[in-house]
């Protein structure tokens, strides 16, 4: 028998060939592409790497003229399929003539299933009755890969249909909204993109920023004391006070005493359960919290998955399935920096396993599948460490702390001091708490502590924090915006479009103007409701409760309604956005010619700089600093050639 195995990428094909051939596979290069061949049990096997999606959807050539194509017609227009690259499809057709069966071994999720089905359609175009089977695995470890190929299943056609529906729906929403906004609001020069997930996500960032701007800080007061040697700090019971007079009255009740008397000491135990297992969104949020962008963290995780070091990194699941081989995984960590901790877990009579709120059956939560490869310290090592420590924490006992509350009295005023000590670090040994804890000295009822100070401390209520990429991902998950695989890409897109900026995310003038205008003149585009409904309907396709045609028709109907609403307010919408984006791009009069304006532009190499609007008559230019400030031009920072001919405004 001659068998073709389809992998999603070259690195995955190499790993599968290495495992299945036990290291005997040979790399073959032909007709501009590479694949792997080997023989096993009398069968000839070819492992062929795809390149992600091998079919692109786009509108016909006649629909690509933005000015001539009516947008209502565009909504109902069927996109055309284009094979890409052509050489890859030619290679597949060549294989079809000689193979007996094909095994789909792309990532097991919606996109992976669709990628495999795209290639399968090319093969069956040549050999209509070609047998196709599916190998499902959640880790590229030798054991799991071999089990998947020993027990293949039928391809999941419904899963692929759900992904195909998403392609059609996202293409239509993105094309129609982007064309409308660019033509009506972009002055013909600036691309203004919008989408059914992108725009509600932008609004989340804008609303949080607006909440912060509108926040009115209120002052409040606490009364604190320092007493004893070494000194302990205690806070007056009854606070905080919303008027300073209340705090002053309480200080007066304390009188002129010179000691704080311990009235009673209470002890209790606090148990903090271990954290839930990582799914994709919580993993990326934690990476963001610790300073790594979600997109970079996902690239590193994908690389670790392909090398067999972690499980599949795209999952909603926060509950380990019963089949998870915890002891086997812990055993693999015996030759790693986590060996001592893993061995202590193995020595326990019973492992306690935490669980999160989301349970699915596609893939398990993220976890290590092998000891880390020996490599230089870098992003992949950091991401592996993040995932491994979280996994070990989820198998660990609760953290136990002894909490002490000491009630002190000065005059007629009661104060409370709280301290804690660690009884059993539990999971915090592998995931230490970064917050410092206070420890109280040994206090007994009746102790008189020398009073050092009583003071009134004024504070102010704090506004809600700006979103970070991590908190935005978690909010998107909670509201049903996007999927585990696309959320970080949407956030990344907002940065690339220059709608948002900064680690603490702020909207740019263009981003704020766009989302504010749409919130008034096309609110359905900016709220999660419509997007969440379409996400639910695509899940219905995956589970066999709806068809691609039904859901695409629903989407088209909704998009017609949104477009009609936007058209009804096209003048107001366009004026709003144009006014705001002009002032964002304009940096004042040119100080060289006085007739032009300094505007932000982008050079051929992608550098942003300030140049005169009268270019090429006036060639005045400045560098832009990280915070947008004007800096003297420097040839060492950007070449004159790259900046010589500016492109459209950034």
Which residues fall in each region the model found?
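Amphipathic alpha-helical transducer elements in NTP-driven molecular machines
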Residues: 10-13, 17, 44-47, 82-89, ...
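Intrinsically disordered, low-complexity regulatory segments
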Residues: 1-173
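Phosphate-interacting basic helix/loop segments used at nucleotide- and nucleic-acid interfaces
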Residues: 78-96, 102, 204-205, 286, ...
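Basic, low-complexity terminal or inter-domain segments flanking catalytic cores
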Residues: 2-4, 122, 178, 214, ...
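Structured, non-catalytic alpha/beta "coupling" segments that mediate domain-domain communication
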Residues: 31-60, 199-244, 393-439
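C-terminal or mid-to-C-terminal helical accessory/interaction module adjacent to the motor/catalytic core
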Residues: 97-98, 140-227, 267-271
């Amino acid at each position: 028998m001659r068998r073709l195995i389809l992998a999603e990428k070259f690195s995955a094909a190499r790993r599968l060939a290495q495992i299945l051939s036990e290291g005997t596979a040979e790399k073959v290069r032909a007709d501009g592409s590479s694949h792997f061949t080997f023989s096993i049990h009398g069968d000839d096997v070819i492992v062929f790497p795809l390149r992600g999606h091998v079919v692109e959807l786009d509108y016909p050539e006649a629909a690509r003229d933005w000015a001539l194509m009516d947008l209502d017609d565009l909504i109902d227009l069927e996109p055309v399929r284009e094979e890409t690259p052509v050489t890859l499809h030619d290679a597949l057709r060549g294989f079809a003539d000689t193979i007996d069966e094909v095994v789909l071994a792309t990532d097991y999720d919606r996109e992976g299933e669709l990628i495999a089905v795209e290639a399968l359609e090319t093969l069956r175009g040549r050999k209509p009755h070609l047998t196709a089977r599916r190998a499902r695995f959640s880790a590229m470890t030798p054991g799991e890969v071999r089990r998947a190929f020993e027990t293949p299943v039928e391809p999941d056609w419904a899963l692929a249909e759900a992904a195909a529906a998403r392609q059609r729906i996202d293409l239509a929403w993105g094309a129609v909204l982007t064309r409308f906004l660019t033509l009506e609001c972009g002055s013909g020069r600036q691309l203004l993109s919008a989408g059914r997930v992108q725009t509600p996500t932008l609004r989340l960032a804008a609303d949080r920023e607006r909440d912060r701007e509108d926040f009115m800080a209120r002052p409040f007061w606490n009364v604190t004391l320092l007493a004893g040697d070494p000194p302990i700090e205690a806070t007056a019971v009854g606070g905080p006070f919303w008027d300073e007079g209340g705090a002053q009255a309480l200080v007066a009740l304390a009188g002129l005493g010179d000691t704080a008397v311990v009235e009673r000491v209470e002890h209790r135990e606090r148990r903090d359960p271990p954290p839930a297992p990582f799914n994709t969104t919580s993993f990326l949020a934690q990476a963001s919290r610790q300073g790594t962008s979600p997109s970079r963290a996902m690239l590193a995780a994908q690389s670790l998955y392909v090398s067999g070091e972690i499980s599949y990194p795209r999952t909603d699941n926060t509950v380990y399935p019963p089949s998870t081989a915890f002891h086997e995984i812990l055993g693999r960590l015996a030759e790693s920096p986590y060996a001592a901790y893993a061995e202590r877990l193995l020595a326990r009579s019973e492992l306690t396993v935490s669980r999160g709120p989301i349970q699915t059956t596609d893939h398990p939560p993220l976890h290590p599948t092998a000891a880390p490869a020996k490599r230089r310290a870098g992003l992949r090592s950091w991401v592996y460490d993040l995932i491994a420590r979280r996994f070990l924490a989820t198998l660990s006992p609760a953290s136990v702390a002894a909490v002490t509350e000491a009630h002190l009295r000065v005059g007629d005023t009661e104060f409370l001091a709280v301290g804690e000590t660690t009884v059993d670090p539990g999971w915090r040994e592998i995931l230490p708490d970064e917050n410092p804890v206070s420890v109280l000295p040994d206090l007994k009822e009746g102790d008189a502590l020398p009073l050092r100070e009583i003071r009134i401390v004024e504070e102010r209520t704090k506004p809600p924090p700006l979103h970070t990429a991590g908190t935005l991902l978690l909010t998107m998950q909670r509201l049903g915006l996007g999927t585990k695989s696309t959320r970080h890409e949407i956030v990344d897109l907002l940065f690339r479009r220059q709608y948002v900026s900064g680690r603490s995310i702020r909207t740019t003038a263009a981003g704020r103007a766009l989302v504010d205008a749409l919130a008034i003149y096309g609110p359905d585009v900016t709220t999660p409701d419509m997007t969440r409904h379409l996400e639910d309907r695509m899940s219905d396709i995956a589970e066999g409760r709806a068809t691609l045609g039904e859901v695409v028709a629903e989407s088209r109907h909704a998009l017609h309604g949104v477009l009609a609403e936007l058209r009804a307010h096209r003048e107001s919408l366009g004026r709003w956005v144009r006014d705001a984006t002009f002032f964002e791009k304009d940096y004042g009069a040119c100080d060289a010619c006085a007739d032009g304006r300094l505007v932000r532009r982008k050079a051929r190499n992608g550098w942003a700089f300030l140049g005169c609007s009268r270019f090429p008559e006036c060639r005045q230019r400045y560098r832009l600093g990280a915070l947008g400030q004007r800096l003297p031009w420097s040839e060492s920072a950007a070449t004159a050639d790259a900046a010589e001919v500016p492109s459209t405004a950034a």
